[in-house]
């Protein structure tokens, strides 16, 4: 428990203190966000706002987790779990892709950043590496960080993704991992369109996963098989990482709240999407994350609907997509959209955790 709080506190302090350093540096160098002319007209005044603030989020998450691990080594003698390192690696790797994209846009002056093919290849390589490694490193109970079984609040034994033999099964599993990672990283990226929206929603999702992974730690099958126990490797490390993500997002939100002094850029949004995906995979709650992260899902689905309907009929379903711009163009103030989406995100997170806890109560009542 102590390590979880320390991870969040250190991450918050690191992000809240390092972000203004980035604001000054990027402002001095003129590395400001370009605003698309076809976007909401109210956003044109944001042109030139420093971006790549996701660097501060990554610093916060990394420092928060490492300090918490060191505290565990000193006070409890317990070393870090491999699951935490793998998810942190995924987060940093996708953050690196986002940084390259931001850097090319801002420093090299190429408006579109990395081309779609290069970005896709980078994400593909990272996801494959992550997918392969999470099936390695079994602990003393033969539990690996990942599982080939599809999961809701825990593994579903009747839904094995890796069917059809070792080779075909591995290919199917890696395709699934690629879909999960790509979906969440792009979903957070789409959500990052209003001041404080993506950082606030991600903080709420991370808060839910602090509770979920801590409960898995308290009821781990590694401590002895019992009714309702969870076959999750290193749940305490996952809780520490979720707490670090929560703290880093809140620290960044201090400066990213309207009117934003800095944007996270693709550096932050792709990294946070990786963190969301990694936590859902290693905690064996991929389908539950769809509920907990419902705002991210809503934003993505709105874009899919808009693009599909427009290509089919030449007409639009929404005034503008993602859907937060639909409400903004409908007369809602930007802060109103953000706060209401935060409230919906909190409702989704509570619903998801309620389902998670309710299943545990059911599993332990027989």
From Swiss-Prot:
Membrane topology: Multi-pass membrane protein
Keyword match Cell membrane: yes
Entry EC number(s): 2.7.8.13
Superkingdom of origin: Bacteria
A Pfam family that the UniProt record links to this protein: Glycos_transf_4
Cofactors named for this entry: Mg(2+)
Catalytic activity: UDP-N-acetyl-alpha-D-muramoyl-L-alanyl-gamma-D-glutamyl-meso-2,6-diaminopimeloyl-D-alanyl-D-alanine + di-trans,octa-cis-undecaprenyl phosphate = di-trans,octa-cis-undecaprenyl diphospho-N-acetyl-alpha-D-muramoyl-L-alanyl-D-glutamyl-meso-2,6-diaminopimeloyl-D-alanyl-D-alanine + UMP
Function: Catalyzes the initial step of the lipid cycle reactions in the biosynthesis of the cell wall peptidoglycan: transfers peptidoglycan precursor phospho-MurNAc-pentapeptide from UDP-MurNAc-pentapeptide onto the lipid carrier undecaprenyl phosphate, yielding undecaprenyl-pyrophosphoryl-MurNAc-pentapeptide, known as lipid I.
Family: Belongs to the glycosyltransferase 4 family. MraY subfamily.
Protein's name according to its UniProt entry: Phospho-N-acetylmuramoyl-pentapeptide-transferase
Organism: Corynebacterium urealyticum (strain ATCC 43042 / DSM 7109)
């Amino acid at each position: 428990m102590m390590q979880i709080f320390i991870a969040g506190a250190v991450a918050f302090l690191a992000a809240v203190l390092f972000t203004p350093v980035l604001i000054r540096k990027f402002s001095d160098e003129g590395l400001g966000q370009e605003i698309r002319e076809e976007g909401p007209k109210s956003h044109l005044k944001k042109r030139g706002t420093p971006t790549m603030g996701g660097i501060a989020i990554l610093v916060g998450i990394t420092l928060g987790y490492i300090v918490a691990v060191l505290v565990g080594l000193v006070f409890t003698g317990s070393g870090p779990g491999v699951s935490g390192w793998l998810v942190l690696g995924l987060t940093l790797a996708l953050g690196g892709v986002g940084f390259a994209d931001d850097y090319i846009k801002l420093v090299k002056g190429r408006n579109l950043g990395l081309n779609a093919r290069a970005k896709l290849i980078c994400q593909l390589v990272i996801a494959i590496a992550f997918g392969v490694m999470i099936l390695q490193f079994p602990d003393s109970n033969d539990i690996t960080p990942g599982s080939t079984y599809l999961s809701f609040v825990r593994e579903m034994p009747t839904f094995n993704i890796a069917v059809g033999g070792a080779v075909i099964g591995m290919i199917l599993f890696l395709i699934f991992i690629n879909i999960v990672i790509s979906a969440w990283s792009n979903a957070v990226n789409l959500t990052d369109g209003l001041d404080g929206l993506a950082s606030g929603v991600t903080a709420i999702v991370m808060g839910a996963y602090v509770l979920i992974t801590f409960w898995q730690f308290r009821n781990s099958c590694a401590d002895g098989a019992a009714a309702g126990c969870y076959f999750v490797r290193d749940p305490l490390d996952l809780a520490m990482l979720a707490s670090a993500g929560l703290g880093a997002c809140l620290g960044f939100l201090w400066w990213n709240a309207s009117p934003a002094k800095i944007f996270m850029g693709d550096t932050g949004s792709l990294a946070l999407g990786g963190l969301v995906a990694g936590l859902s995979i290693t905690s064996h709650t991929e389908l539950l994350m769809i509920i907990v992260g419902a705002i991210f899902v809503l934003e993505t689905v709105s874009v899919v609907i808009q693009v599909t309907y427009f290509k089919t009929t030449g007409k639009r379903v929404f005034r503008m997509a993602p859907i937060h711009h639909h409400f903004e163009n409908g007369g809602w103030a930007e802060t109103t959209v953000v706060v209401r989406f935060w409230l919906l995100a909190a409702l989704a997170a509570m619903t998801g955790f309620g389902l998670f806890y309710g299943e545990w109560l059911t599993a332990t009542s027989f």
